[in-house]
Amino acid sequence: KDSGLFVISGATGSGKSTTLYAILDAINKMYKKNIITLEDPIEINKDYCLQIEIDDRKGISYHESLKQILRHDPDVIMVGEVRDEKTAQLALTCALTGHLVLTTIHASNCINTIKRLENLNISSLDLEDVLLGIMTQKMRFNDKKEVFILSEYIDQKNLLKYFDRKKIDYYDFSKAACTLKNVGVLNEK
C-alpha cells in the first residue's frame, strides 16, 4: 500500500523497532521509496533514508519533527513511537494525506492497540479509514536461552470487520513467523 497506518505494539524490549527496520529494509529493497524516520534514539543507522533523532530536551519532538519533514515529501514515514495525542493526530493526518506511516505503541495486544489509539483521541472512523494492520509482539526465551517472538496480527480486512463489530480472525504465530522470516526478522532455525 502507498498510504495508511501500520502499527506494531508490545512491551519495551519486545523487538518492535527491529521489526520496523526490517519492514523499512524490505520497502527500500523492493520499491526505493523516499523514507524518513523519527526515532528516540536512532537504534540502527540506515544509509537509504533520512533519520532524525528526537530529543525533547532540545525541543526536537515527534510532533514538531513530523510537521517539518512533510516539506521533504516522504513516501514512507517511520514514527519510532506514538507517545501522546499530538503525535498520534499528526501521524493520522500523514496517513490520511497519502503517506505510508509505520509506528509503534505500547499495548498488550492488537485490540488494546486500537483502544490506546482511541484513548489518544483518534476516532474509530479515522482508524477504519487508515489502519492497514496491527502486529503485537512478545519476545520470549526458550530453555536454551534462544529468543523467539510470539506475535498476533490483524490485517486490514479483519480490522474492518472489527469496526463493524463482526467476528475477526487473528493470524496465529506460524503465519506471523512466516511473514517475519520473509522480511528478515527471524532466521530459518
Spans of model-derived segments:
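Short, flexible helix-loop junctions that flank or precede catalytic/ligand sites
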Residues: 1-189
